[in-house]
Amino acid sequence: SLNTTVSFPNSPAFNASTERWTIADPPTYIAAIRPGTEEDIGKVINLARTKRFPFLTRGAGHGYSASLGAFQHGLSLDLSQWKTLKIDKKAQTLTVGPGVTFAEIFDPLFKAGFYIQTGSCSCPSMIGVTIGGGIGRLMGKYGLLMDALQSVRMVGAGGKVMRVSATSHPDLWWGILGAGANFGVITSATYKVHPLVNNGNVFIADFYLPVERSREYFDIVEANYSNMSANLAQIMVASWNRTTSSVQLGGNWVYYGPEKEARKELAPVFNLNATSSTRIVRWSEIISSAGFDEFICQPNQPRSLFSLNQKIYSADGYQAGFEKIEKYFYDHPGGRDTTLVFENFPNQAVAAIPDASTAFPWRDFKGFIQINFAWTAGDDATAQASNKLGKELRNQFATTSGYSEKAIFVNYAHGDESIENIYGRRKLPRLAQLKKKYDPSNLFAYNHPLP
């Protein structure tokens, strides 16, 4: 179509169509195409299948799996300009295109009187996050982001446009809900949204503790919040404080309800008498008010992530990991933009959905551990130390995660894990059958690929 454009290396258009959040383990491209229509996407897919050249779909450029490094000298299928956003107030639905990021839904949805469960930073593609599951602070109330999904339009490996839902291609729908990157190019997605509660206001409390009080804080979390309210969520971050030249622990709590209820829920934390701040913000401002989104969302940075699901909160495990990251900060000053993140999220609504109903394998988790390594481009020594420590910490945290083997959320996976650890042993046979049926040529083979 006239709206489809092709670009080549060393041009501004090409750079825009291949920009990534992380420059670690990069895929490489010989050309980029911005398709103007679903039909043109189908033509690209058909050419890729018949001519046997690789392509990689791009929404917001936030994919960071090391497995993407296996993609070399291919085509970027850039959908970042597909920014359709439609709210149907009567049906209480939101429809978005693959280029729409979380940042772009907050204000329109809030102004329309709705909200939805989202991720914890603003820059990824909403659809990209969804098809791996989509976790976040509201999953105790409303489930995973994919649990809000009602239907998608997708160009499949055969080049044809399909509407996929619980009643249209239900077998493929099952696979999209947890392993969606393996089956086609999603061009739009429709979600169920919820009317705002508490006038759309949420209570936020931030706590900051010096290194010597880390264990005390971890004990409070394990003892009081292992079965937290569905309205409550916390993200803990261990980071280097450049002002004090030491490690600090921060806890960002969000409560979806009145301040009085929030303060009652958080009484054990307030009783620590730690440095703290509180505020009431609109739902649409939660991420921007947390203070780390702008830094996290900077593109074109060397980053490497290692992660693990947690079924239990272990103060012993948290403290052991905290001490290792503290040593890393002192031994490797070039890595002091690194963060160790513990996401403590309730899972009532996630666990209420039958495990067999979707491909997603981890409905029993209550949170996630992430080590987000960051260093300066060219600092190979810090990069190597980060990779080594990331694997060590992942193995160490696995012993106190509550799982019998490593369980890793696909959107957080590093890319070196076994597919059993990512997709779950019991889900893989059915996923493998779906892959053979819907993508027999294995065109979608780079982002945590199925066998």
UniProtKB/Swiss-Prot annotation:
<dbReference type="Pfam" id="PF08031">
    <property type="entry name" value="BBE"/>
</dbReference>
<dbReference type="InterPro" id="IPR016166">
    <property type="entry name" value="FAD-bd_PCMH"/>
</dbReference>
<dbReference type="InterPro" id="IPR006094">
    <property type="entry name" value="Oxid_FAD_bind_N"/>
</dbReference>
<comment type="similarity">
    <text>Belongs to the oxygen-dependent FAD-linked oxidoreductase family.</text>
</comment>
<keyword id="KW-0285">Flavoprotein</keyword>
<dbReference type="InterPro" id="IPR036318">
    <property type="entry name" value="FAD-bd_PCMH-like_sf"/>
</dbReference>
<dbReference type="GO" id="GO:0016491">
    <property type="term" value="F:oxidoreductase activity"/>
</dbReference>
<dbReference type="Pfam" id="PF01565">
    <property type="entry name" value="FAD_binding_4"/>
</dbReference>
<dbReference type="InterPro" id="IPR012951">
    <property type="entry name" value="BBE"/>
</dbReference>
<comment type="function">
    <text>FAD-linked oxidoreductase; part of the gene cluster that mediates the biosynthesis of virensols and trichoxide, fungal natural products that contain or are derived from a salicylaldehyde core. The pathway begins with the synthesis of the reduced chain in virensol C by the highly reducing polyketide synthase virA via condensation of one acetate and 8 malonate units. VirA has interesting programming rules since the first 2 ketides are fully reduced, the 3 following ketides undergo beta-dehydration, and the last 3 ketides are only reduced to beta-hydroxys to yield the trihydroxy portion.</text>
</comment>
<keyword id="KW-0274">FAD</keyword>
<comment type="pathway">
    <text>Secondary metabolite biosynthesis.</text>
</comment>
<dbReference type="InterPro" id="IPR050416">
    <property type="entry name" value="FAD-linked_Oxidoreductase"/>
</dbReference>
<keyword id="KW-0560">Oxidoreductase</keyword>
<protein>
    <recommendedName>
        <fullName>FAD-linked oxidoreductase virF</fullName>
        <ecNumber>1.-.-.-</ecNumber>
    </recommendedName>
</protein>
<dbReference type="GO" id="GO:0071949">
    <property type="term" value="F:FAD binding"/>
</dbReference>
<dbReference type="InterPro" id="IPR016169">
    <property type="entry name" value="FAD-bd_PCMH_sub2"/>
</dbReference>
<feature type="domain" description="FAD-binding PCMH-type">
    <location>
        <begin position="22"/>
        <end position="196"/>
    </location>
</feature>
